[in-house]
Amino acid sequence: MATVKAVCVLKGEDPVKEPVKGPVKEPVKGIIYFEQQGNGPVTLSGSITGLTEGKHGFHVHEFGDNTNGCTSAGAHFNPPGKNHGGPQDNERHVGDLGNVIANKEGVAEVCIKDSLISLTGSQSIIGRTMVVHEKEDDLGKGGNDESLKTGNAGSRLACGVVGIAKL
């Protein structure tokens, strides 16, 4: 059974340096590692720093294009054309990985196992963009059209392209 590994370096925009009292907030950044054995689930591990405390939407977006920042990454990766949902839902985008949770220091430790994304084949996320969002993903339960598209997760704080890693 072959093992495939990948990595994603998340980088946020530099914060606006305004004349305010207090420390300047560091940009959001992180490293996420992916591993898949055969056709099994993909395990994601790593950490993200510079977040506000609480939940932040975490998704795979359709394009590996970051030429215009995280906006160039397009919508959530969704080849079957389904509505947005949570990682445990049958009705969800392939790229819907739910939320990461940042502690009071702004650090989110990522430990996710997902059976819908893949590092090979038609559901492969290789060459696509991972995005961490400003707000909590409502998992498609927000009761409005935007919830069924994005989970009302807000702006894109940091992103990076998923690439094959050395075994």
Swiss-Prot record:
<feature type="repeat">
    <location>
        <begin position="19"/>
        <end position="22"/>
    </location>
</feature>
<comment type="function">
    <text>Destroys radicals which are normally produced within the cells and which are toxic to biological systems.</text>
</comment>
<feature type="binding site">
    <location>
        <position position="96"/>
    </location>
    <ligand>
        <name>Zn(2+)</name>
    </ligand>
</feature>
<feature type="repeat">
    <location>
        <begin position="23"/>
        <end position="26"/>
    </location>
</feature>
<dbReference type="InterPro" id="IPR036423">
    <property type="entry name" value="SOD-like_Cu/Zn_dom_sf"/>
</dbReference>
<protein>
    <recommendedName>
        <fullName>Superoxide dismutase [Cu-Zn]</fullName>
        <ecNumber>1.15.1.1</ecNumber>
    </recommendedName>
</protein>
<keyword id="KW-0862">Zinc</keyword>
<keyword id="KW-0564">Palmitate</keyword>
<keyword id="KW-0560">Oxidoreductase</keyword>
<keyword id="KW-1015">Disulfide bond</keyword>
<dbReference type="GO" id="GO:0005634">
    <property type="term" value="C:nucleus"/>
</dbReference>
<feature type="repeat">
    <location>
        <begin position="27"/>
        <end position="30"/>
    </location>
</feature>
<keyword id="KW-0539">Nucleus</keyword>
<keyword id="KW-0677">Repeat</keyword>
<keyword id="KW-0186">Copper</keyword>
<keyword id="KW-0449">Lipoprotein</keyword>
<dbReference type="InterPro" id="IPR018152">
    <property type="entry name" value="SOD_Cu/Zn_BS"/>
</dbReference>
<feature type="binding site">
    <location>
        <position position="84"/>
    </location>
    <ligand>
        <name>Zn(2+)</name>
    </ligand>
</feature>
<dbReference type="InterPro" id="IPR024134">
    <property type="entry name" value="SOD_Cu/Zn_/chaperone"/>
</dbReference>
<keyword id="KW-0479">Metal-binding</keyword>
<comment type="similarity">
    <text>Belongs to the Cu-Zn superoxide dismutase family.</text>
</comment>
<feature type="repeat">
    <location>
        <begin position="15"/>
        <end position="18"/>
    </location>
</feature>
<feature type="binding site">
    <location>
        <position position="93"/>
    </location>
    <ligand>
        <name>Zn(2+)</name>
    </ligand>
</feature>
<comment type="subunit">
    <text>Homodimer.</text>
</comment>
<feature type="disulfide bond">
    <location>
        <begin position="70"/>
        <end position="159"/>
    </location>
</feature>
<keyword id="KW-0049">Antioxidant</keyword>
<dbReference type="GO" id="GO:0005507">
    <property type="term" value="F:copper ion binding"/>
</dbReference>
<keyword id="KW-0963">Cytoplasm</keyword>
<feature type="binding site">
    <location>
        <position position="76"/>
    </location>
    <ligand>
        <name>Zn(2+)</name>
    </ligand>
</feature>
<feature type="binding site">
    <location>
        <position position="133"/>
    </location>
    <ligand>
        <name>Cu cation</name>
    </ligand>
</feature>
<dbReference type="InterPro" id="IPR001424">
    <property type="entry name" value="SOD_Cu_Zn_dom"/>
</dbReference>
<feature type="binding site">
    <location>
        <position position="76"/>
    </location>
    <ligand>
        <name>Cu cation</name>
    </ligand>
</feature>
<feature type="binding site">
    <location>
        <position position="59"/>
    </location>
    <ligand>
        <name>Cu cation</name>
    </ligand>
</feature>
<feature type="lipid moiety-binding region" description="S-palmitoyl cysteine">
    <location>
        <position position="8"/>
    </location>
</feature>
<dbReference type="GO" id="GO:0004784">
    <property type="term" value="F:superoxide dismutase activity"/>
</dbReference>
<dbReference type="Pfam" id="PF00080">
    <property type="entry name" value="Sod_Cu"/>
</dbReference>
<feature type="modified residue" description="Blocked amino end (Ala)">
    <location>
        <position position="2"/>
    </location>
</feature>
<dbReference type="GO" id="GO:0005737">
    <property type="term" value="C:cytoplasm"/>
</dbReference>
<feature type="binding site">
    <location>
        <position position="61"/>
    </location>
    <ligand>
        <name>Cu cation</name>
    </ligand>
</feature>
